[in-house]
Amino acid sequence: MSPKTLYDKIWDAHVAHEADDGTTLLYIDRHLVHEVTSPQAFEGLRMTGRTVRAPDKTIAVPDHNVPTTLGREKADNMTEDSRIQVAALDTNAKEFGIHYYPVSDIRQGIVHIVGPEQGWTLPGMTVVCGDSHTATHGAFGALAHGIGTSEVEHVLATQTLIQKKSKNMKVEITGKLRPGVTAKDITLSVIGHTGTAGGTGYVIEYCGEAIRDLSMEGRMTVCNMAIEGGARAGLIAPDEKTFEYCMGRPHAPKGAQWEAAMSWWKTLYSDDDAHWDKVITIKGDDIAPVVTWGTSPEDVLPITASVPKPEDFTGGKVGAVQRSLEYMGLTSGTPLSEVEIDTVFIGSCTNGRIEDLRAAAEILKGKKKKDGLRAMVVPGSGLVRAQAEEEGLADIFKEAGFEWRLAGCSMCLAMNPDQLQPGERCAATSNRNFEGRQGRGGRTHLMSPAMAAAAAITGRLTDVRDLM
């Protein structure tokens, strides 16, 4: 048998049918659903008289549109479109008998945090969702990626998906990370190295000592942004950390089923002589705390750098940089550490887990945010929120002057009440800094939770190492 990558192994195990041209019908183990990309899909089932093929493998959570303030069940601070979408998900989940975590359930949260938290995400699975950041689940050694609404309907009806196989790409982060450098700095640095199109046509496997050293939550952060690097999905081979995380979760296998699953999970790694179509190697100690400066995730630099000049670039990038600087209101040559901010957002499916909140609280403990600055922490799930309150993290945030919110996607995207106003500048732990992503005219700088906390204290982009 020829050597295989982790991606090869998972793919081959899920092929239901393959045509001569490589078009493949792939079996799907888990289908995650939220309120924005699912209403038309469920309506399509009704129109054709179909049911959900595997309701026991379909999990629904409202997250994109839901407000994160107390009293949100009343829905009086949602737009009409948002109310309709959340109500539709509630109706569809009940009618079609799928697993559902409504807003009133403490287990509700961002779908990519709820899935792993509840044990729905397991090694070797195929996982899809009508959301681009489904790649998050690749941290478990699961083949996970986003799909469109028509594909959502197809998976609901058949539990399969028509696909063509991607190429294999290895991203190796060698050695150890330096103090103050986090999983978010890794994933942003990789995108800065490859560009947002560097992974197009590939599934990325992240490996190396620095990746192995990460916790499961850190690995989820890395895989979450594989899509920003252009990749179809991101993967990390499962190991003892993975198995320990999964054990005992509500929907993880138990007893003999656990042992049987483990016997397969332990084979989920890339063989030594497996073929890679592309390999990128980055030294862990070359990675510094980073921030984005422009309107693409590839516009990333160490916090110690300065705003770049358009003439430092070539080709079409020159004009793109000029437009980015104009939109962001930045002047070339300005040290990034002198860029003042108006807002801090800590949360999202990239950095809304308990370890992210711990990292931010560690920087904020005993300190206050800068006067006049708006700052909020939005836990990724109700369970994360409860744990943070139990650990005293919520008190640290509130004493520092932060708003302590309920779970949801929040200010990651302008689809709910948490938005930037035109011209406002935000230090954000989310995953996209596109024009208008956080609100029309809003300016977004991506960074780690610790870096965002540091920025809240000083009121400007700040090297967290100066506060450690």
From Swiss-Prot:
**Residues engaged in binding [4Fe-4S] cluster:** 349, 409, 412
Sorted keywords for this record are:
4Fe-4S, Amino-acid biosynthesis, Branched-chain amino acid biosynthesis, Iron, Iron-sulfur, Leucine biosynthesis, Lyase, Metal-binding
The record's InterPro entries line, in alphabetical order, gives: 3-IsopropMal_deHydase_lsu, Acnase/IPM_dHydase_lsu_aba_1/3, Acoase/IPM_deHydtase_lsu_aba, Aconitase_4Fe-4S_BS, Aconitase_4Fe-4S_dom, IPM_dehydratase_rel_enz, IPMI_cat
Instruction: Describe how the cofactor binds.
Output: Binds 1 [4Fe-4S] cluster per subunit.
Cited Pfam families: Aconitase
Look up the record and give one Gene Ontology term from the biological process aspect.
L-leucine biosynthetic process
Reactions that this protein is recorded to catalyse:
(2R,3S)-3-isopropylmalate = (2S)-2-isopropylmalate
Q: Which PROSITE patterns match?
A: ACONITASE_1, ACONITASE_2
Q: Which cofactor does it need?
A: [4Fe-4S] cluster
Q: Which SUPFAM superfamilies match?
A: Aconitase iron-sulfur domain
Q: Which CDD domains would you find in this protein's record?
A: IPMI
Q: Which pathway does it take part in?
A: Amino-acid biosynthesis; L-leucine biosynthesis; L-leucine from 3-methyl-2-oxobutanoate: step 2/4
Q: What EC number(s) has UniProt assigned to this enzyme?
A: 4.2.1.33
Origin superkingdom = Bacteria
| GO function term, MF aspect, one | metal ion binding
Assembly: Heterodimer of LeuC and LeuD.
> What does the similarity note say?
Belongs to the aconitase/IPM isomerase family. LeuC type 1 subfamily.
Question: What does the UniProt function comment say about this protein?
Answer: Catalyzes the isomerization between 2-isopropylmalate and 3-isopropylmalate, via the formation of 2-isopropylmaleate.
Protein name per Swiss-Prot or TrEMBL: 3-isopropylmalate dehydratase large subunit
